[in-house]
């Protein structure tokens, strides 16, 4: 997926816009909403040999996503969002999953019967909760 999205970004497109458009294209494709799908695709040049056009890269990224989701139980869109659409574009910063897992491991206490404790210091996207 990253390779395909990076191929589009490398042509001078904004990473935030590419990610947002990719999600929109997937949604409108599954809904069979051609007018909205074509509206998004109209933002891209789509020139070049078959397999190297922006539309080809978007389609290949979807194929990679579906293959990845079929092969693993890992969450993938959240980390991609954090990489391409968040940070300096939106002012959103997320706790990296490896840091959240470390924090969850340090903070875990033996559970009391019927009692659960949740510690998510930023109360943002829930990375610490997911890691626990």
Model-predicted regions and their roles:
Residues 1-122, 128-131:
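Class I S-adenosyl-L-methionine
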């Amino acid at each position: 997926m990253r390779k395909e999205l990076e191929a589009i970004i490398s042509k001078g497109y904004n990473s935030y816009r590419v990610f947002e458009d990719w999600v929109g294209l997937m949604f409108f494709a599954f809904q069979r909403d051609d007018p909205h799908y074509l509206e998004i695709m109209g933002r891209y040049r789509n020139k070049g040999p078959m397999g190297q056009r922006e539309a080809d890269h978007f389609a290949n990224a979807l194929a990679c996503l579906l293959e990845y989701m079929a092969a693993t139980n890992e969450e993938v869109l959240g980390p991609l969002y954090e990489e391409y659409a968040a940070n300096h574009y939106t002012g959103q910063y997320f706790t990296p999953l490896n840091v959240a897992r470390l924090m969850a491991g340090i903070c875990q206490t033996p559970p009391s019967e019927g009692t659960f404790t949740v510690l998510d210091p930023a109360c943002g996207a829930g990375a610490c909760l997911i890691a626990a």
